[in-house]
Amino acid sequence: MGMLIARRLAFMVFVLWGITLVTFFLSRVVPGDPARLLAGPQASPAEVAHLARFYGLDDPLIVQYAHYLRNLLHGDLGFSFVTRRNVRTDIATFLPATIELAGCALLLGFVLALITGTVAAYRRGTSADAAGRLSAIAGLSLPVFWMALLLQLLFHTKLGWLPLGGRLDPGMTPPPHITGLLTVDSLLTGNFATFINAVEHLVLPVVVLAAGVYGLMVRIMRTSVLDSLGEEYVRTAEAKGLSRWRVLRRHVLRNAMLPAVTVLGLEFGLLAAGVFVVESVFQWPGLGNYAFQAIQANDYNATMGATLVIAVLYVVINLIVDIVYLYLDPRIRYA
């Protein structure tokens, strides 16, 4: 088990290095001049050239990349030309909002899919099975952008039940910063009014993001539970007189969860892509919105910093998934 984890860690290093390489050179291919952006539209060519020399933007690409890697190893992600702040400071500011949004969406989608997929498998061929499969198709097929606008139109414009976007109402005072997660910080400080307001702002973007997770996981859970129900050990457990709930909990779900856990790590990649759209539509001040604005402004350092952080989160989550998989399946642990 230790060797497997060590190999995963070594593989992570190469993956992250490859991401820095691809992101760096792609950002240089995109048309635009960061020095001009930093200097402003009224700056003279001499001032623009001075800034390019100062930040090393006129050096050969291989030299720029070497400087970038050296700074990266020292924890320096560079300077954002848009916010005029250190990229590491920006990421520390915007990342908690994205973690809160994506984490709630992943949890909601997984739990609902676990319940729906299991019920659909146990009631195969019934109306409950058909409803579960239909909801899975809807979750996978509805475009994220269209669903976000539709929910805004229905629940904010028409019904007025939920806010349009943002993390809090304009007049609401944020809780003291502890974790950066507004729901957690408001509970830790006993500010329940802020907690309710933060949850209200979370509902629509979380539902939009969770739809894709739910759609894929329902199909996987249904198929996995059906496969497990046909195994000899399940029929043996039922023949011994064990209750349906005990058979489900101890024998069916433990084995049916293996494919679901594997896909769960890949789902984060889909969430990362959806976050860019959802945060833009709902004006959610997270890392996806920050990266989207950085790409539009051709802000090299901010784009690469945000991409690297998302990549680190992705490989770390997949490492955790691998470890959980080793725990769930002893055949791999002792192989």
Where are these regions (language model features)?
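Alpha-helical transmembrane segments of integral membrane proteins
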Residues: G2-L4, V13, I19, L95-A128, ...
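Hydrophobic alpha-helical segments of polytopic membrane proteins
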Residues: A6-R8, V13, L151
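Hydrophobic alpha-helical segments of integral membrane proteins
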Residues: L9, L51, L61-L77, V87, ...
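Hydrophobic alpha-helical transmembrane segments of membrane transport/permease proteins
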Residues: V15-A66, L151, F155-T194
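Transmembrane helix irregularities
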Residues: V30, G139-L142, A272
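An internal, D/E-rich "acidic patch" concept
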Residues: D58-L114
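Short loop segments and helix-boundary regions at transmembrane helix junctions
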Residues: V119-L142, M147, L153-K158
